[in-house]
Regions:
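All-alpha RGS (Regulator of G-protein Signaling) helical domain and cognate RGS-like helical scaffolds
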Residues: 46-48, 78, 84, 89-99, ...
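Soluble non-cytosolic domains of exported or imported proteins
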Residues: 66, 70, 74-78
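C-terminal segment of N-terminal export signals and the immediately downstream linker at the start
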Residues: 30-65
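Generic preference for hydrophobic
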Residues: 53, 188-190
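Acidic/His metal-coordination segments adjacent to aromatic residues that form catalytic metal sites
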Residues: 62-66, 106-111, 192
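N-terminal secretory signal peptides
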Residues: 1-12, 20-23, 29-30
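Short, intrinsically disordered, charge-balanced linker/junction segments flanking boundaries
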Residues: 195-201
Length: 201
């Protein structure tokens, strides 16, 4: 399913994505359940992204056995750091107001360069990924998130199946997402490369 087939307002995405346990990138119940069950306060903190790389709040090996330390280190120090560096260059070249959050740029990314789109998306997606992952995850979501998953997909297992399919069938690189729609139902989709559901593309 393309995300454009299930329109989601930016406001709804921002206010509900933490509550929905926005799941990104990698698949498997161990990784998916690492997402936060908390709602609005965390959403505002998570979704006011700066234009610079935030230090990682846990050791590179903290997510093992789901993600090994070397993969985390390379991803954080090379890939994500590269997106942040190149985003900084694009921001300077295009005179972007960095006093506002990156989300404001992503919401109007069609007005900016390909460099801004690729690196702004790459930086945002990775910053979100680092913030919503935790070494102390439960086996599966609980509380409101569990109820929302069951209501939207029928069961946690059905959700995992759809999420894994979205990730595995994305040609090349990209991200799988769990988002809240206008109808307050959760849905799964994917975006190519470093695009994300906040972008007006």
């Amino acid at each position: 399913m393309k995300l454009t087939e299930n329109p989601i307002s930016r406001r709804k995405f921002l206010s509900n994505s933490s509550k929905a346990g926005l799941a990104v990138g990698l698949v498997g119940s161990g990784i998916l359940s690492a997402c936060s069950n908390e709602a609005k306060g965390d959403a505002q903190a998570i979704l006011a992204t700066s234009f610079t790389q935030t230090p990682l709040s846990f050791d590179f090996g903290a997510l093992e056995p789901h993600i090994d330390a070397m993969t985390m280190e390379i991803h954080f120090t090379k890939h994500a750091a590269g997106y942040a560096k190149n985003l900084g260059e694009a921001v300077g070249e295009e005179n972007v107001d960095t006093n506002k959050p990156l989300e404001d740029v992503l919401a109007k990314i069609s007005n900016y360069s390909t460099k801004m789109r690729n690196n702004g998306g790459g930086h945002y997606n990775h910053e979100l990924f680092w913030q919503i992952m935790t070494p102390d995850a439960a086996e599966r979501p609980e509380g409101d998130l569990a109820e929302a998953i069951n209501s939207s997909f029928g069961s946690f297992e059905a959700f995992v199946e759809q999420f894994e399919a979205a990730a595995k069938t994305r040609f090349g690189s990209g991200w799988a997402w769990l988002v809240v729609g206008e109808d307050n139902k959760l849905s799964v989709g994917s975006t190519p490369n470093q695009d994300n559901p906040l972008m007006d593309i």
